[in-house]
Structure formats: structure tokens, C-alpha cells
Amino acid sequence: IMIVSYQTGMEFLQDNQAYLQTNPYLSTFFTLDAPLLKQADKINYALRCEQGDKRLLALKIEPYNLLLFGEEACAPELLRFLFDGGYEIKNYLCASELGYVLMQKMQSYGRCYEEALAMDFMEARSITEPSAPEVETAREDDLDEIFDCAQRFVSDCGLLDKPEKEPFRKILDSFRIIRADGKIVSMARIAPATQDDLRLVLVYTRNEYRGKGYARKVVNSAKNEILTSGKRATLNVDRKNPVSYHLYLSLGFERMFSQGEFRRVE
């Protein structure tokens, strides 16, 4: 059994790049967050736990969740190292199966966790229906409306993020929208992800316009645009949201894996 502790995030990435690439979708956050770790301590850290040919990676950078990637067999050893060393844990994000094992093992340390956010990662590789001509790209003067919808989306999903308006200005051209009655009624953002995919995020339809097929048009048109550019279309869907889930399945999205955000319960 061996635990490797890294001083910087770049060192961690270089050493574990090949392993992270075994599931590039699940490891996206590692690639995004790791460069932010300049000097490891007990609050911000990057670790690898090895047991025979099994391994488990851990990366924690404030203010983000502790990220975990790898095999459940290493969970007890990693936890022992973290608790013995006085490392901060807080909330964590990982594949659901691994998350459940950690949740169970944490109980012996007197810590209770729950899967507060349960997401399925889905992918589409083929066009299933034509794009809708009324779907358009957001303009500069749509900033207020898009920000308003984004805030509603965040509170609907029970996310802890507090979005800021200014950053939205730079990414307006990545939003696809439908208007009705003089306002934006449904939207989705095409966001950069890995080399192979573009991700649909912030998929939102105003309450009073739901069930009228607007989301389907926006999502399908954005999906087609992604596929036409030569990439795969991916998204995360909340497992507690059967309506969205059904919509994505009907547009040819397939579930690849489940991941969860596990929050501490006092």
C-alpha cells in the first residue's frame, strides 16, 4: 500500500494523466481544477493511493468539492490517511458507486453523508430529428434575461452556486434560445468540455412554458450543432428529474455513468 502526496496540481496531473484518461468524462473536473493547486497543505491537496494494481486519486482545491477518481478497494486506506493526517474533507464528488462505499466507511469516523445531487452523465452520437429554425443564438441585449433564467435554473436544481452576471456577457454566443411572447422562454448553453465532446449545460425552460415542446427544440438543435461540428454531445441530468430524463432519452442520449455530490449531514 502506498500513498503519494503531490506538492502541486501540475505534478499530480503529469503523473496521473494516463489513468485519468481511462474515463475522460469522469475526470474533467480534475483536469480543470488541478492547475489551480500551487502549494499543497491540509486543506488543498492532491493524493494517489495505490494497492497492488488498484488506485484511487483525490484532489481538493478550495472552494470546490473534494474530487475522487478510481477504485473502491482503496477507499479505506485513503480515508485512514486523510483522517490520521488531519486533512479537511467537507463535500465530495465522484462516481456514485465509489461515493456510496466512502459514505459507508465514513460512518466509522463519525461522519454522516448523503448523496445530495445524483447525476447521470449522458452522451449522444447521432442526429435523430432535424433542427428547429426558430432556435437562435443569444444576442448582447439578452444578457439580463439569460442571467435571470440562469438564476432560476440554479435554484430549481438546488445548487449552491451563486452566479455572477458579468461572466455571462463573454459567453452569450454559446446560448441557444427560443422566444415566445416577446421573451426568451427556453435556453441551453453549448459549453467546452473535453477534446471529444461539447456539453449542454444550463438547460432551462420558464415554468409557464413547460410541456409545450420548447426545450425539445432547443436541446435537439444544440445537439445537432455539436454533432455537425464533429464532436459528441454530452450532458448531466438530475436523476430526480424524470421529465428531462425522458426528453434526453427520446433524443438519442444514452446514460454512460452516474455521479453524485455527497454532502455532510450534521
Summary of predicted features, one role per range:
Residues 51, 59-64, 148-197, 201:
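Acetyl-CoA-dependent GNAT
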Residues 4-5, 20, 24, 31-85, ...:
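Conserved donor-binding loop and adjoining core beta-sheet/short helix segment
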Residues 98-113, 216, 240-257:
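Conserved active-site alpha-helix within GNAT-family acetyltransferase domains
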Residues 62-132, 262:
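Acyl-donor-binding surface of acyltransferase catalytic domains
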Residues 87-95, 226-237:
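Conserved GNAT acetyl-CoA-binding A-motif
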Residues 93-99, 235-245, 261-266:
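Conserved beta-strand-loop-alpha-helix junction that forms the acyl-donor binding cleft
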Residues 1-28, 124-160:
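Short amphipathic alpha-helix that is part of the acyltransferase structural core
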Residues 73-80, 205, 211-227, 245-250:
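Conserved acetyl-CoA-binding loop-helix of GNAT-fold acetyltransferases
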